[in-house]
Amino acid sequence: MSEAELDEFLAAERTCRVATSGPDGPHLTALWFLWHDRTLWLTSITRAKRWAQLKRDPQASVLVDAGHDYGELRGAELRGDVEFVGEAPRTGENVPELAEPEKLFARKYFGVDQMFHDGRHAWLRMRPHTVVSWDFRKLG
């Protein structure tokens, strides 16, 4: 995919799979995400296994894919280190760098302009160092 196609694809999709690594091996979970300004934003429960694993080792691989039949398959793998942004868990403190991602995430998933803070989730940011994408619709 071109950069523009990748941006459009990641903006439209809703669920990604996040791979982390821990003492007992790989761990794979599905999460909602936001792609904004070439940055992947994830919100995670702070008591989740993935949170503890990312605290120990911030490296992650994220997969977003779509399509059912072979000729429809497309997707992207993003690899990089995850950063923890804002308070954990998130309670709504003023964190300027979260203002735009929270607004866009709230619109995408809840149809509102303001993020609800439940005191269980917190933000993760990945600025991928590697992106591999594919679009099998272009093959034929």
Predicted regions and their residues:
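Short secondary-structure boundary/capping segments
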Residues: 7-8, 32, 52, 68, ...
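Structured helix-beta-strand junction loops
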Residues: 12-13, 56-57, 129
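Extreme N-terminal tail/first-helix region
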Residues: 1-16, 72
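Charged, gly/pro-rich active-site loop segments
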Residues: 1, 73-140
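Short, surface-exposed beta-strand-loop junctions and turns on beta-sheet-rich folds
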Residues: 48-50, 69, 140
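Short beta-strand segments
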Residues: 13-46, 54, 62-65, 74-76
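A short, aromatic/hydrophobic, helix- or strand-capping loop or linear motif
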Residues: 20-22, 64-67, 110-119
